[in-house]
Amino acid sequence: GKVKDDKPAPPKRPLSAFFLFKQHNYDQVKKENPNAKITELTSMIAEKWKHVTEKEKKKYEGLQQEAKAKYEKDMQAYEKKYGKPEKVKKIKKSKKGSK
């Protein structure tokens, strides 16, 4: 079997400005559209994001920068203590082309 080490998971990557905006607006959009699917809600939020003022976008970009700085600091501390985290390889499913 695979030996599980006691290393904690490395810090999670910071969210993008759009994802922070999405998190911030999701409940409100859901409340306004209770029967919408998640994909529809995401589209609505994306549409809102397109029309957000530069000032508002800067707010989320600032939050993203803070999250990124924290992530980098946490990652340095993690690497100092545990070494670089192993990259998880994504397995690509090969599609057999039929010609």
Curated annotation (Swiss-Prot):
Q: Which domain of life is it from?
A: Eukaryota
Just give the chief location class: nucleus
Q: Which GO terms describe its cellular component?
A: chromosome; nucleus
Protein name (record): High mobility group protein
| Species of provenance | Tetrahymena pyriformis
Name the DNA-binding segment ranges.
11-79
Query: Which residues in this protein are found as Phosphothreonine?
Result: T42
Which keywords does this Swiss-Prot/TrEMBL entry list? Chromosome, DNA-binding, Nucleus, Phosphoprotein
According to the UniProt entry, its GO molecular function terms are: DNA binding
The record's Pfam families line, in alphabetical order, gives: HMG_box
Residues bearing Phosphoserine are: S16, S43
**SUPFAM superfamilies hit by this protein:** HMG-box
Cellular compartments annotated: Nucleus; Chromosome
Q: How is it modified after translation?
A: Phosphorylated at two positions (Ser-16 and Thr-42 or Ser-43), each 6-7%.
